[in-house]
Every structure is written in structure tokens, then in C-alpha cells.
């Protein structure tokens, strides 16, 4: 037994003389390596998050305005005066809208062309949807209607007019897809009809409770029909006539580089939506006191201020692509957005109001109805030949200026 112990001792001394690690050190070596690997993985993950955050923040100059997000939330939480709450949260929504568009674009790149186009169509007017739902919950039906109409007019007249002027700076005549233009003309006509018919129906009935109830039923029935048409429009654009409605060269040239993964895009979309909802809630909640302090009408706030601010990032995009000569893209952003609001967002909010017992209708005041009809008529006339120039853009901008002037003096 003693001899065996001596032999084992000699072997251990021999191993140590050749710098072989002892058994206990050998067993600890993999554990130390594992801890090192985990530490490196955490550092790489942190660097990856920092890199993605930097890329997201540098994706648009509008992100410099993100500083207004916490300030706007603080102003709303501590109930500052209405003007401060409204202005700060209005400024906060601008970069949030840009981030929402960025997250949607990243998700669409991952999802593929068809599903990506559907995502862009669904989230294209997310700001108007969020503001509309929050205003609807508060019973601010006038804000909902005026913001919908204002978004349509700002896209048709202001944005499309600026696109025509911008592209006219570099080109004498600009052409675009005549098939897409004709389809949009038909959809704009249907959009106008969904507002003209309820207005005419209202004026043809006596002013009593039964008439209001009948108008509500007509609006809700119209909303269901129009939503079906909108779904069929998506099928037309994304499936059956995809080759006609989309220019592959323009889509390829305008595709953004992929920065975020699937989970990162979804997480960013969810987080930004939450912040938009918070800022929009404070924004809508301050309107009643704001119109009393500043002495302007709710119609002007909803029809002019909210649409321009909420779509600022999208408006800039349309102007930039039109300057590059990509008028089909500009047409899709400007007029396509108006069609989406009229055929999807407005009827969808009517259905939401139906569900939560808010009597939102598609009936607009006579001045608003006439202005929409004139605007759609002018745009239809300008795009029906598939070519345009800068003077036509000036005409659209002039009409928008007249509309703003009229609603500035519109009584409360």
C-alpha cells in the first residue's frame, strides 16, 4: 500500500515538473472559459444594440425632435397650460411618425414584397388612426371628421401640389403610369361619393330624431360597403395587377437597407405606437381648452394643423422622390394616402364608433363637402392624361391656401 502511494506521489511530482495543471485546476478551466464566452456575448449584444440604435436615430433628421417626446409627456402629466401641452405633443408626434414609418419599412423588407406592401398600406396612416380612435373615445366627433377631411385635402392639394412643383424644377414635363392614374381617378370619385351621398341624404330629410337615426344607418352601411371595396383594391394592387401598379425599377431603387431584424422591428413598432398613443391622447385632450384660449375653431385645428403635423415625415418623402423624378411613388404616397383615408380609415372609424356607441357618420358640413368635391375634380382633371408640369402644382397649392383661409375664419 505504501509503495502504491509513493508511486502516485512520484507521478504527480513528475506531472508538476512538466507544468501540467493539477486536477482541480483542470476542472475549473472550462468553467472560466464559459464565463468568458458569456461575457463576450453580452458585450457583443450590447454593441449590436448600440449600433442599431445609432442607425435608427440617424435614419432621419426628424429624430432630432425626439427630445420633445419626454417634455410633451411631462407637460401632459403635470397638466401644463393647453397651448404648451398641444404644441409640445404636436412636435413630439412628428419624429414618432417618422420612426413608425421606419419600423414599418424595416418590417416590410423582412416580410417580402407582397406582405411588405400590405404592411405599408395598413400602417401608412397609423397616426390618423391613433388620433381618430382616441378622439372618438373622448366623444370628439368633430375633431375626427375634420382631421379625416384635412388629411385628404392636405395630401391631394398641399403634398401633391408641392410634388408637381418640385419635379417641375428639373423637368419640363413629367409623366407617370396612366393605368395607375386612371384607377386612382375612379377611387377618388368613389371616395367623394361616400361623402356626397350622406350629405345629400341629410339635406333631403326633415330635421328630427328619425332623420338622424336614418343618417347613422346609411353611414354605417356605406362604411361596410366601402371597406369591402378597399380590400378588393388591395387585391388588385398586390396580386392580380401587381405588374401594372408597381414599377420594379422604382421600388428597387427606393428600397431602404435592412437595419433591424424581425423581433427588433416588431418591438420598435409596438414601443413607438405606445408613445404615439400617449402623446396623441394629451394632444386631443388639450384641444377644447386650446380653442377657447386661442379663439380658433376645432374644425381649423383638425382640418389644417393635425394633418400637416402628423404626416410631416410622409410629406417630405413624397417631395424627395418627386424631385428624383419618381412620380409613380409620389403619386402613391400623396393620392394613394388620400384614397386610403377615404376608403379605409373613415369607414373603419365609423365602424369603431358603432362598436363603442359613438354616433360617427359620414355626413360633413356643406362647405366641407363642396371643397372636397372641387379638390377631387381638379386633381382628377390634372392626372387623367398621365403627364403634368409645375404650373398644375401651383394651382393645387393655390386651392389649398384658399381652403386654409376659409376654415381659419370658419365659425366655431
Swiss-Prot record:
Protein name (database record): Vacuolar calcium ion transporter
Lumenal side: 77-83, 136-148, 199-215, 286-299, 356-358, 411-412
InterPro entries (UniProt xref): CaH_exchang, CAX-like, NaCa_Exmemb, NCX_ion-bd_dom_sf
GO cellular component: endoplasmic reticulum; endoplasmic reticulum membrane; fungal-type vacuole membrane
Transmembrane intervals: 56-76, 84-104, 115-135, 149-169, 178-198, 216-236, 265-285, 300-320, 335-355, 359-379, 390-410
Keyword Lyase included in the entry's annotation: no
Protein's organism: Schizosaccharomyces pombe (strain 972 / ATCC 24843)
Known role: Has a role in promoting intracellular calcium ion sequestration via the exchange of calcium ions for hydrogen ions across the vacuolar membrane. Involved also in manganese ion homeostasis via its uptake into the vacuole.
GO MF term list: calcium:proton antiporter activity; metal ion binding
NCBIfam families with a match to the protein in the record: caca2, cax
Mode of membrane association: Multi-pass membrane protein
